[in-house]
Amino acid sequence: LPGLLPDLDDETALQVASIRSLAGLPVTTLRRRPPFEAPHHTASAVALVGGGSRILQPGAIARASGGVLFLDEAGEFSGHALDALRQPLESGRIEIHRVGFRAVLPARFQLVVATNPCPCGNYGIPGDVCSCPSLAIRRYLGRLSGPLIDRIDIELGLQRVSATQAVGAGVTSAAARERV
């Protein structure tokens, strides 16, 4: 997905470089490509939001500003971590409050969420059998709260594809970007 996005303008590229520098990541040139953050589903709310006791550490939300925040296996994230997305999605900024300081960082990102229909991944899949009790399915999908779902503009159900089908698509990111 980030390969489809346009290059960053000067102001956004500078913001991205500043946030990377704050996060302790190397900044040798002003990158024009949008950032892409894909935290692991075990990431805590602090890993998403950021923090630090003495030195500010931008989290994945701020590091994705100007680009894409991809949450794969979103149903596996804690509800607390997912709820941390609500305020930045609404306001376009992230506020970090710690003893002795308050920081406001940009948080204008495209959120892409992928999740299975249930913990085993087979619910509703033709030819597969779901082994999950209905309570487990409700609990799993319940981690995506109503207020968070309200901030997701496009919802798309997909069927499984084989590795051969995925590779056979034949459209490069560059070609798709030209069409966009």
Q: Locations of the language-model features?
A:
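Conserved AAA+ ATPase core "coupling" helix
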Residues: Q15-A17, A107, N122-V180
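Inter-Walker segment of RecA-like/P-loop motor cores
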Residues: T29-G50
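AAA+/SF3 P-loop NTPase mechanochemical coupling elements
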Residues: F36-E37, L56, A60-G66, I96-P117, ...
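Walker B catalytic acidic pair
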Residues: G66, D72-A74, A84-L85
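A short beta-strand-to-loop transition that corresponds to the Sensor-1 phosphate-sensing loop
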Residues: D72-A74, V99-G100, V113-C118, L135-A136, ...
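Conserved D-loop-proximal element of ABC-family nucleotide-binding domains
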Residues: S78-H80
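Conserved catalytic/switch belt of AAA+ P-loop NTPases
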Residues: L82-A103
